[in-house]
Amino acid sequence: MKIRPLHDRVIIKRIEAEAKSAGGIVLTGTAAQKSTRGEVLAVGTGRILDNGDVKALAVKVGDKVIFNEGYGVKTEKLDGQDVLILSETDILAIVEA
């Protein structure tokens, strides 16, 4: 299935971090925190400004990002995997290699 976000929305696939404690113990269940890193799968056309102009998004498909998972972040199933739909303002940083 193909999904196309609207306006300033971004579709992200979470990149799961290995859940280990500082001592090397593998954490499971509620002890393991969800990763706030992901890969951008799709982006909208841009943010609509007050004057009607459209400002292109700073992120692009394939970018690795760090995001804030808070109010307004929606989880959906896409082809059997969980993806996140969020506003570009919920993205805190682009991870550059």
UniProtKB/Swiss-Prot annotation:
UniProt subcellular location: Cytoplasm
Cysteine pairs bridged by disulfides in the record: none
Pfam families cross-referenced by the UniProt entry: Cpn10
KW Cytoplasm (keyword) present: yes
Gene Ontology terms describing biological process: chaperone cofactor-dependent protein refolding
Keywords linked to the UniProt accession: Chaperone, Cytoplasm
CC per GO annotation: cytoplasm
Keyword Isomerase annotated: no
PROSITE patterns recorded: CHAPERONINS_CPN10
SUPFAM superfamilies in alphabetical order: GroES-like
The protein's role, per its UniProt record: Together with the chaperonin GroEL, plays an essential role in assisting protein folding. The GroEL-GroES system forms a nano-cage that allows encapsulation of the non-native substrate proteins and provides a physical environment optimized to promote and accelerate protein folding. GroES binds to the apical surface of the GroEL ring, thereby capping the opening of the GroEL channel.
Subunit-level organization: Heptamer of 7 subunits arranged in a ring. Interacts with the chaperonin GroEL.
Entry protein name: Co-chaperonin GroES
Organism whose genome encodes this protein: Aeromonas salmonicida (strain A449)
